[in-house]
Amino acid sequence: MSNPFSLEGKVALVTGANTGLGQGIALALAEAGADIAAAGIQAPTETEEKVKALGRRFVAIEANLISIEPVQRILDETLAGLGRLDILVNNAGLIRRTDAVDFSEQDWDDVMNVNLKSAFFMSQAAGRHFITQGSGKIINIASMLSFQGGIRVPSYTASKSGIAGITRLLANEWGSKGVTANAIAPGYMATDNTAQLRADQDRNKSILDRIPAARWGVPADLGGAAVFLASSASDYVNGAIIPVDGGWLAR
């Protein structure tokens, strides 16, 4: 019997895969059998070494998704380097922390451009390819703030609420064409983006006190959800926003 979770012969494009959540997702997909294209502003040297150590092919694409200018080039370089594309993971993200009363237009635009605008246009470019080939998996990275308001991160909250919305929209439009669009909503993860929170003793304690798992998540915690949504095991899952949060939203 074939393994519905196998990604053998598949190619996944992961944005922002040089570190943190993107790296964890890329490695999980590679462990399941996928070859990996990684697009980002920094060279994903460590990710490349780890993926190749698993016996998978790897293509690194330098691109800054604060604008949509490199979107088509990212797709073209993926296809040129690996010959196909089956899975898109829109992981590249940015966060800026300031009280709403003081939040700047520049910070608003930067976060929205990376987190929402580029994610949509990456999905559009990949979606055209997926529709032509009759299959494809889009995995967006949402957030607990796709469900909640948060504090001091107005553009991040807006962008992640938007990610949930466009995930459902793409599922509605492309589901009949063999393309699924789903999202993973990570909880509090121990990454560079949360270093400031973890360094604040009181804030760190208040967060941990609410998480039933009683710990911060790590990038590898997203691996199972990513492999599921990338594989044929999830072919009838579409438009879902799946929390991976240690139980945070259950409280």
Question: What are the language-model segments listed below?
Answer:
Residues V11, N18-G20:
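Conserved glycine-rich cofactor-binding loop
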Residues A32-E46:
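Conserved glycine-rich Rossmann-like NAD(P)H-binding loop of the short-chain dehydrogenase/reductase
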Residues S143:
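Residue(s) in the substrate-gating loop at a strand-loop-helix junction
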Residues G175, T180, V237-G239:
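Short, small/polar-rich loop/turn modules that mediate ligand/substrate recognition or access, typified
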Residues S123, S159, T167:
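Active-site helix of classical SDR
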Residues L82, F120-S123, S135, R215-V244, ...:
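C-terminal substrate-recognition "lid" of short-chain dehydrogenase/reductases
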Residues V71, D99-A100, S104-M112, I207:
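Substrate-binding pocket helix/loop in short-chain dehydrogenase/reductase
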